[in-house]
Regions:
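N-terminal accessory targeting/assembly segments
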Residues: 1-107, 111
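Conserved G1/Walker A P-loop phosphate-binding module
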Residues: 7-15, 143, 147-199
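Short hinge/gating elements
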Residues: 18-22, 55-59, 112-119, 154-169
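Short secondary-structure transition/capping segments
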Residues: 20-23, 88-101, 128-136, 153-161, ...
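Alpha-helical initiation/capping and key positions within long helical/coiled-coil segments
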Residues: 26, 125, 129-132, 164, ...
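Short alpha-helix plus adjacent loop in nuclease-associated cores
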Residues: 109-131
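A charged, well-structured terminal subsegment
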Residues: 130, 134-148
């Protein structure tokens, strides 16, 4: 008699989106585009919040009322992550995450995460890791203490074989140099192979 194996599909991360709106951009197009990006990252979008950039808050990018609205929604509808359709500073990432108590991804980190999911070659995986490290390095001073909300299961600094996100400046800088050297080595090898084929 054959054994029956029940295959459980891993649930997609439940996310909410916040879109800062520019008067010159089409709101529906912006909503559709960021939703497609989230879908590509394996996310399940629960709700989209938006606010005019006129209400820009340097600390959290959104007004206090909007932040409270999202916080109240999350109390009733727990989600794994907030995706902000904007490039955030390290302090903004940390401030929003501290206010909401969940992981926060900005647009850049979301796109890097999609590349991580689709990277198949050795070079592709190295390039993803390099992009992640450079992203972290520019935001390092503000992200200290937020490590737990970047690593782990699901989207956000997802990478080949990574279980812990390194937030040490010297180690990051050293790894960036190593990764750049590895990429250059791969490119040189490819050039040499092409020259040999052409002979």
């Amino acid at each position: 008699m054959k054994k029956m194996h029940q295959i459980q599909e891993e649930e997609n991360e439940k996310v909410v989106i916040f879109c800062p709106l520019n008067k010159e951009e089409d709101k529906d197009y912006q909503f559709a585009e960021i939703s497609r990006l989230c879908f590509s990252a394996g996310m399940d979008v629960q709700k989209i919040f938006s606010q005019s950039l006129d209400a820009f808050n340097r600390r959290t990018i959104m007004g206090t009322g909007k932040l409270e609205e999202i916080k109240n929604y999350l109390k009733e509808n727990p989600c794994d992550c907030l995706v902000v359709d904007f490039q955030l500073t390290g302090s903004q990432l940390r401030n929003i995450s501290d206010e909401l108590g969940i992981k926060v991804l900005d647009r850049i980190l979301l796109i890097i995460d999609i590349f991580a999911l689709n990277a198949k070659s050795s070079e592709g995986k190295i390039e993803v890791k390099l992009a992640q490290n450079k992203y972290l390095l520019t935001r390092l001073s503000s992200l200290q203490g937020s490590q737990g909300r970047f690593g782990g299961k699901g989207a956000g600094m997802r990478g080949p074989g990574e279980t812990k996100i390194e937030l040490d400046r010297r180690k990051l800088e050293k790894e960036i140099i190593t990764l750049e050297a590895e990429i250059e080595k791969i490119k040189n090898s490819r050039r040499q192979n092409r020259i040999l084929r052409e002979k």
